[in-house]
UniProtKB/Swiss-Prot annotation:
Pfam family, one: Crystall
InterPro entries referenced in this protein's UniProt entry, alphabetically: Beta/Gamma-Crystallin (IPR050252), Beta/gamma_crystallin (IPR001064), G_crystallin-like (IPR011024)
Region of interest called Connecting peptide, as start-end residue ranges on this chain: 101-106
Entry remark concerning the domains of this protein: Has a two-domain beta-structure, folded into four very similar Greek key motifs.
Subunit and partners: Homo/heterodimer, or complexes of higher-order. The structure of beta-crystallin oligomers seems to be stabilized through interactions between the N-terminal arms.
Keywords (A to Z) from UniProt: Eye lens protein, Repeat
Species, as recorded: Aquarana catesbeiana (American bullfrog)
Free-text description of this protein's post-translational modifications in UniProt: The N-terminus is blocked.
Protein name from the UniProt record: Beta-crystallin A1-1
Source taxon at top rank: Eukaryota
GO annotation terms (biological process): lens development in camera-type eye; visual perception
Domain Beta/gamma crystallin 'Greek key': from-to ranges: 14-53, 54-100, 107-148, 149-197
Length: 198
């Protein structure tokens, strides 16, 4: 039987329904907490889903590894509804968990020019479709401190490319190096950032 709640997660308003076929067809299962391996629940993959409450992170591989996808309230009929803006398209979603710290109204993030919180810094409290257009000097971010909420950072302007989900309740909110942004992080190139909505 699947281990559906491996992480200690406070009770919250989270609900996601997953389907093994596109357009909400086939086998379905509802979750109110994390799932480390959808195959242990009798699915070979997730092809569509509905986020009914809360915000979630979906992962390309089991055990919360690989490319990340932010999943906010709404319907995702085919796989490309959550993967279309990524640098490479992935038809796989094998694990997921709720984003406990998503707090759109109170979100606060500080980005730094270099690793280990060194160099020029900039405080963010809003969504930025292009960091450079808003005054950030280059297309790279060395490190970040999430002081409140949860954020999704994108490789390219316009919320495109690889997604890196940063949370105030993971790593103590401190991401001192780009390798801490996720198991799939390839570069410290960040050109757009937005708050995750609950």
């Amino acid at each position: 039987m699947a281990q559906i709640n491996p992480l200690p997660v406070p009770l919250g308003p989270w609900k996601i329904t997953v389907y093994d076929q596109e357009n909400f067809q086939g086998k379905r299962m509802e979750f109110t907490s994390s799932c480390t391996n959808i195959m242990e629940c009798g699915f070979d993959n997730i092809r569509s889903l509905k986020v009914e409450c809360g915000a979630w992170i979906g992962y390309e591989h089991t055990s919360f590894c690989g490319q990340q996808f932010v999943l906010e309230r709404g319907e995702y009929p085919p796989w490309d509804a959550w993967s279309a803006t990524n640098a490479y398209h992935i038809e796989r979603l094998m694990s997921f968990r709720p984003i406990c710290s998503a707090n759109h109204k109170e979100s606060k993030l500080v980005i730094f020019e270099k690793e280990n919180f060194i160099g020029r810094q900039w405080e963010l409290r809003d969504d930025y479709p292009s960091l450079q257009a808003m005054g950030w000097g280059n297309n790279e971010v060395g490190s970040m401190k999430v002081q409140c909420g949860a954020w999704v950072c994108y490789q390219y302007p316009g919320y495109r490319g690889y997604q890196y989900i940063l949370e105030s309740d993971h790593h103590g909110g401190e991401y001192k190096h780009w390798r801490e942004w996720g198991s799939h992080a390839q570069t410290f190139q960040i050109q757009s950032i937005r708050r995750i909505q609950q």
